[in-house]
């Protein structure tokens, strides 16, 4: 029984973000569709070859996507919302982009589909839309074309397909309500057709992803798996693939399925591999997800070997990444600025492929010398002074309940804030960032490369901040922001100014579509050596009589959008960050900044996948925010911002944050999210986002007014703010001006009644 290895997927954006650049060039009309498609082909060929050279036996095909893999699946099934369809009924790459962005180089603009997080990761997908009586047919053959490409290149191919039950689980019903699970029998023939096409191509194994099987699913959904897979069996071998959690709670459902193998995440799940082996059918292949696909740390391969060795030779076995390597940067070897000690602690996607090759070879030969050599830096890290800071650990241990309590309740604070700011009804503001123009990015890049001295850099940033203030005053906004010209990324910027973080040059991972982020890496105890945002906030406030918000990224979001340490709990990291940012709140307040926004867009996405684990997470997540904010005086108004969220199941925790104002993403869901706040009788102020910043479409005054009137039916108007869904960093100035002018006009119209 020779053990093979494989990955569940590979990063698709390219080491230098080639995919992002090609997409954005195409969207802007600067390149042709064929040029875009060529970049995709080149990236796929390169990535297959890189994995093969690193020692991977079975290459994933179908993990590439032009926007996200759920949207690719929607097109595969012919599930295109009517508003995005071509007049002739055909489907092309612009159809896909219209669903994702609301517009494309061809076709009529229409509201983009809703976007949300992929399970508990920082990757997003476009939510499939389902209507009653919907028909499905094989429409978009990208998967088959890519399999043909890989076969022509001589690769050992393992196609990757999102499973039918998970696909339905991830979607939403539009219009007349019905049970979307009832569509299962309608989509299965398309899956059968795809599997038949793969069988024709001589494919032996298909990786069929059903990550919903790690959730606490309703019984009806669990019951749907057996008939679904009964319908899919027989054409190729199916590797039922799960990740992000363990499968033991749903193992009875899984073992009844007519599949030939099971992939389990042995990093994030608590499954005991020997017990799994005992319970799985003896003729099934077990794919052991031993290498963390979601982090950047070098694996302790001696530990991984010990974890799996007891079942070697007892069944067919593959070793694999825990999940797709999509969530990891591509290649550590191109990082030239990390010092040697720290660099030795990491492994990116290609290094993880090498780890899988080392592990496979050791399991097949019994020789573990190479594993011990690879794992040596991990032992050194455990004792490094780069990791441990006694002062931070002492301060954390000294936290009391008082440290997470504002001096007075919201009603008392609100009165003090009204007296201080004297804002009109329907106060207008933005979420924080303004367009990151080419000039701003060039300025930052020149400074980073040493082509610009500090004085000229600061002068340039100051001018962009001044322009942002002038623009906002001209538009008539009530509460201003400084625009964040100095920030490349809302998490990276803070990480760069906090001890305990390191950064990469090319550690890009995809967030959604063409958006890539370069997450900081938490390597040690976190502290703040000096004020971070105070100077620019104070400067911006000096330019205007209107209040300017101080802008902080909250502790849970910094944690969730970084690669965390694995040697301490997430709670410990979050509270260390909270203490560091607590000092920043105090310094902003002392500098005369009266409104401070602490963004926590990641609070909900950090939830464990199983509801039974939620309470513990929410308890420390809320406490971290409150530790951060509670130092503020009564007349300092604390805002928070959240996006892409379903709030109804965590409203207690949202209220427990005790922010004076919460701004939320609501426009894509047509204010649906406000139902949660209405039903809960949320006591503080709310700014429901009135337009979708992820789309370049400019909303009309009438559209915004209608949304605000809808909001006022749920939340008393005196507690409503008017703002976009999210920051405006990715938009251009012309559409930003137009959209904000309409937003301000809508607010003024409502004030006049």
Swiss-Prot record:
Sequence positions that bind L-homocysteine: 431-433, 484, 599
EC top class, as a word: transferase
Catalytic reactions on record: 5-methyltetrahydropteroyltri-L-glutamate + L-homocysteine = tetrahydropteroyltri-L-glutamate + L-methionine
Alphabetized InterPro entries for the sequence: Cbl-indep_Met_Synth_N, Cobalamin-indep_Met_synthase, Met_Synth_C/arc, UROD/MetE-like_sf
A single GO molecular function term of this UniProt record: 5-methyltetrahydropteroyltriglutamate-homocysteine S-methyltransferase activity
Binding site for L-methionine: 431-433, 484, 599
Gene3D superfamilies listed in its UniProt record: 3.20.20.210
Pathway: Amino-acid biosynthesis; L-methionine biosynthesis via de novo pathway; L-methionine from L-homocysteine (MetE route): step 1/1
Metal-binding recorded as keyword: yes
Active site (UniProt): 694 (proton donor)
Cofactor(s), names only, from the UniProt record: Zn(2+)
Keyword Amino-acid biosynthesis found: yes
Gene Ontology biological process: methionine biosynthetic process; methylation
Residues binding Zn(2+), per UniProt: 641, 643, 665, 726
PANTHER family: 5-METHYLTETRAHYDROPTEROYLTRIGLUTAMATE--HOMOCYSTEINE METHYLTRANSFERASE
Function text: Catalyzes the transfer of a methyl group from 5-methyltetrahydrofolate to homocysteine resulting in methionine formation.
Entry's family note: Belongs to the vitamin-B12 independent methionine synthase family.
Protein name in UniProt: 5-methyltetrahydropteroyltriglutamate--homocysteine methyltransferase
Provenance organism: Escherichia coli (strain ATCC 8739 / DSM 1576 / NBRC 3972 / NCIMB 8545 / WDCM 00012 / Crooks)
Name of encoding gene: metE
């Amino acid at each position: 029984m020779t053990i093979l290895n494989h990955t569940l997927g590979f990063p698709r954006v390219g080491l230098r973000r080639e995919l992002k650049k090609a997409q954005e060039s195409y969207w802007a009309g600067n390149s042709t569709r064929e040029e875009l498609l060529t970049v995709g082909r080149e990236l796929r060929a390169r990535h297959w070859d890189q994995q093969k050279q690193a020692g991977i036996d079975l290459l994933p095909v179908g993990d590439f996507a032009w926007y996200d893999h759920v949207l690719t699946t929607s097109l595969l099934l012919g599930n295109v919302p009517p508003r995005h369809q071509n007049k002739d009924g055909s489907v092309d790459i612009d159809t896909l982009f219209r669903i994702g962005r609301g517009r494309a180089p061809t076709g009529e603009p229409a509201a983009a589909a809703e976007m949300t997080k992929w399970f508990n990761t920082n990757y997003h997908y476009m939510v499939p839309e389902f209507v009653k009586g919907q028909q499905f047919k094989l429409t978009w053959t990208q998967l088959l074309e890519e399999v043909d490409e890989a076969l022509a290149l001589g690769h050992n191919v393992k196609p990757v397909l999102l499973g039918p039950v998970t696909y339905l689980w991830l979607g939403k019903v539009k219009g007349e309500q019905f049970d979307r699970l009832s569509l299962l029998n309608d989509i299965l023939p398309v899956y059968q057709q795809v599997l038949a096409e793969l069988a024709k191509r001589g494919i032996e194994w298909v990786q069929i992803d059903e990550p919903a099987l790690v959730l606490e699913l309703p019984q009806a959904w669990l019951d749907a798996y057996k008939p679904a897979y009964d319908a899919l069996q027989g054409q190729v071998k199916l590797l039922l693939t799960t990740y992000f959690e363990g499968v033991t709670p749903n193992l009875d459902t899984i073992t009844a399925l007519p599949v030939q193998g099971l992939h389990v995440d042995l990093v994030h799940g608590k499954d005991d591999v020997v017990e799994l082996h005992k319970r799985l059918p003896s003729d099934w292949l077990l794919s052991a997800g031993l290498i963390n696909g979601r982090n950047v740390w070098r694996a302790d391969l001696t530990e991984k070997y010990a974890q799996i060795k007891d079942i070697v030779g007892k069944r067919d076995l593959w070793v694999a990444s825990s999940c797709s390597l999509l969530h990891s940067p591509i290649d550590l070897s191109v990082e030239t600025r990390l010092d040697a000690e720290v660099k030795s602690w990491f492994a990116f996607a290609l290094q993880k492929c090498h780890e899988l090759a080392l592990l496979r070879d050791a399991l097949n030969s019994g020789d573990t010398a190479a594993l011990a050599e690879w794992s040596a830096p991990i032992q050194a890290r455990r004792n490094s002074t780069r990791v441990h800071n006694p002062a931070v650990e002492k301060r954390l241990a000294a936290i009391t309940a008082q440290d997470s309590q504002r001096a007075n309740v919201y009603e008392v604070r609100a009165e003090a804030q009204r007296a201080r700011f004297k804002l009109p009804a329907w106060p207008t503001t933005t979420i924080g960032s303004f367009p990151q123009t080419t000039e701003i990015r060039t300025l930052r890049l020149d400074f980073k490369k040493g082509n610009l001295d500090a004085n000229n850099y600061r002068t340039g940033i100051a001018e962009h901040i001044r322009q942002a203030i002038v623009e906002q005053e001209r538009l008539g906004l009530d509460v201003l922001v400084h625009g964040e010209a100095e920030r490349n990324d809302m998490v990276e910027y803070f990480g760069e100014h906090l001890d305990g973080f390191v950064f990469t040059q090319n550690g890009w991972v995809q967030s959604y579509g063409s958006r890539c982020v370069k997450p900081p890496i938490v390597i040690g105890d976190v502290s703040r050596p000096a004020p971070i945002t105070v100077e620019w906030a104070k400067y911006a406030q000096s330019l205007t009589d209107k209040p300017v918000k101080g802008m902080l990224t909250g502790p849970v979001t910094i944690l969730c959008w970084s690669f965390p340490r694995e040697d301490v709990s997430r709670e410990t990291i979050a509270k260390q960050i909270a203490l560091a940012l607590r000092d920043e709140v105090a310094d902003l307040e002392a500098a005369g900044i009266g409104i401070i926004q602490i963004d926590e867009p990641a609070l909900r996405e950090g939830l464990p996948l199983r509801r039974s684990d939620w309470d513990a997470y929410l308890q420390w997540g809320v406490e971290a925010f409150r530790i951060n904010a509670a130092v503020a005086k009564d007349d300092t108004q604390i805002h928070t911002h959240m996006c892409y969220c379903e709030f109804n199941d965590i409203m207690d925790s949202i209220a427990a944050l005790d922010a004076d104002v919460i701004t939320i993403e609501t426009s894509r869901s047509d204010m649906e999210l406000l139902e949660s706040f209405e039903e809960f009788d949320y006591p503080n102020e709310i700014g429901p986002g009135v337009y979708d910043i992820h789309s370049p479409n400019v909303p009309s005054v009438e559209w915004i007014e209608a949304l605000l009137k809808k909001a006022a039916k749920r939340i008393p108007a005196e507690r409503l703010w008017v703002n976009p869904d999210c920051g405006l960093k990715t938009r251009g100035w012309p559409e930003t001006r137009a959209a904000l002018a309409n937003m301000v006009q809508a607010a003024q119209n409502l004030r006049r009644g």
